Regions:
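Metal-dependent amide/peptide-bond hydrolase catalytic core
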Residues: 26-32, 46, 56-57, 208-210, ...
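Bacterial N-terminal signal peptides
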Residues: 11-21
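Acidic/histidine-rich catalytic neighborhood of metal-dependent amide-processing enzymes
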Residues: 143-219, 281-288, 434
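Bacterial N-terminal signal peptides that target proteins for export
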Residues: 1-11
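Short, flexible, mixed-charge acidic loops at enzyme active sites
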Residues: 120-130, 219-222, 286-291
Length: 435
């Protein structure tokens, strides 16, 4: 027993020394910021619970607006000027919340979140639920947890009057999970805010590496699409491969797709044919991602269509892929003809030197707070997000929100302690950037 007490005493002493070392790396004001965050850890989770219990699926505009009103009240209390940005009614989207304050001190910051979730009103997951040491709920980590981190980081700074004379804009979009169309309209407010800012921080959830360490995102691949249309000569199947009948549309489509696989691939570039239809008669509606086909085994296919996505990290990479794909499509088999068209959706967030400097500043804040270094997540491990629309204009850092698992599934959850950790890191980073 005495040995156990001695071991506990040594451990307590070591922890105290580590805490003292971390505190020594922070200024007196920064130590007060950390204390202010910790003081509200319980209240932050309570606020998060209230927002999670309001359904805000993208296609539930009133629910999105209600969650927006909850966050708007918090920003109003912190002295921000707030407004709701409506979108055209035909888009059937709720709109966006914007909160801003203007000053002349330090960098002008843009903080990005979103109010909507993938959990619509008919989802079986509707409420906050404790599961052991985890919390389960719709949007608890993607991304109402990130939104709460933004509010609580700013609240800690406001307590010390550290927001005075700073320029900070917060944009919470209401349709991140399923954006309205056209994107030029739905993301106009976000782009406008970026053009008035120096740096942007996105609070999507943190992704852990293979060793279980927190990372941050300095690059995200673009999301774009392609449509392949092939025509062949309809004829009796006995003549397939002949000079007069040719190979048909399905063989040509298969040749093209396989050539894409063999000749176009490179690191950080992916292209996935998500749907394909072929036969004598085909129809495909890209608006609803559905198609149909009619054909007989004794008739050479006259039509083939395939739709896919293309994800790339830089525009140079996109252009190389487009050129290779067009060259493959142009080399048609006898009796067939093909064409390919491309469409753009989310622009790339390339891993620029400015993004890397932001990561270094964020990692240093984390180290100084005793929370460990933060490494960059490989871009191929994240999907598309709102931060990509501002990446062409400012240096960006994303993925600095909460830690959770099962995003976009009925098992989406949150590690509760990650809210406090991420809030401390964010508050210190914002404080240092705005001095």
């Amino acid at each position: 027993m005495n040995v156990q007490r001695g071991q506990r005493a040594v451990l307590a002493a070591l922890l105290a020394l580590l805490a003292a070392d971390a505190a020594a790396a922070l200024t007196a004001a920064e130590q007060q910021i950390v204390a202010a965050v910790k003081e509200r850890s319980g209240a932050a989770l309570q606020f998060l619970e209230r927002t999670v219990n309001v359904n805000s699926g993208t296609l539930n505009p009133e629910g999105v607006r209600e969650v927006g009103r909850m966050f708007r009240a918090e920003f109003d209390q912190l002295g921000f000027t707030t407004r709701w940005v409506d979108l055209p009614p035909a888009m059937q989207r709720a709109g966006h919340l914007v909160a801003a304050r203007e000053g002349k001190q330090g960098k002008r910051l843009l903080l990005i979140g979103h109010l909507d979730t993938v959990f619509e009103k008919d989802s079986p997951v509707q409420r906050w639920e404790r599961k052991g040491d985890r919390i389960r709920g719709p949007g608890v980590s993607d991304m109402k947890g990130g939104d709460v981190i933004i509010v609580e980081a700013l609240r800690a700074l406001a307590k010390l009057h550290a927001l005075d004379n700073t320029s900070i804009t917060v944009v919470f979009t209401g349709d991140e999970e399923k954006p309205g169309s056209p994107l030029e309209v739905t993301r106009a407010e976000l782009v406008s805010a970026a053009k008035r800012s120096d740096l942007a921080l996105g609070f999507e959830g943190i992704v852990k590496d293979k060793q279980g360490r927190d990372t941050a995102t300095i690059g995200r691949r673009a999301s774009s699409g392609w449509m392949l249309t092939v025509t062949g000569k309809p004829a009796h199947s006995s003549g397939v491969f002949s000079e007069s009948s040719g190979f048909g549309a399905i063989y040509e489509g298969a040749r093209i797709l396989n050539a894409f696989r063999e000749q176009v691939a490179e690191p950080d570039l992916t292209f996935n044919p998500g749907a394909a239809v072929g036969g004598t008669e085909v129809s495909y509606d890209p608006a609803v991602n559905k198609g149909s086909a009619f054909g007989k085994t004794n008739v050479i296919a006259a039509s083939f269509r395939a739709q896919g996505d293309l994800r790339y990290l830089t525009y140079e990479q996109r252009d190389r892929a487009h050129a290779r794909m067009r060259a493959i499509v142009a080399k048609s088999l006898p009796g067939a003809k093909a064409e390919i068209t491309f469409s753009e959706s989310y622009p790339p967030m390339s891993p620029t030197p400015g993004n890397l400097r932001l990561l270094e500043a964020y990692s240093q804040a984390s180290v100084d707070a005793g929370l460990g270094a933060i490494e960059a997540l490989p871009p191929g491990q994240r999907g598309a997000g709102d931060v990509q629309f501002v990446a062409p204009y400012v240096a960006c850092l994303d993925g600095i929100g909460p830690s959770g698992e099962g995003s976009h599934t009925n098992d989406e959850d949150l590690e509760p302690g990650s809210i406090e950790r991420a809030t401390i890191r964010a508050a210190l980073l914002i404080y240092r950037l705005t001095r």
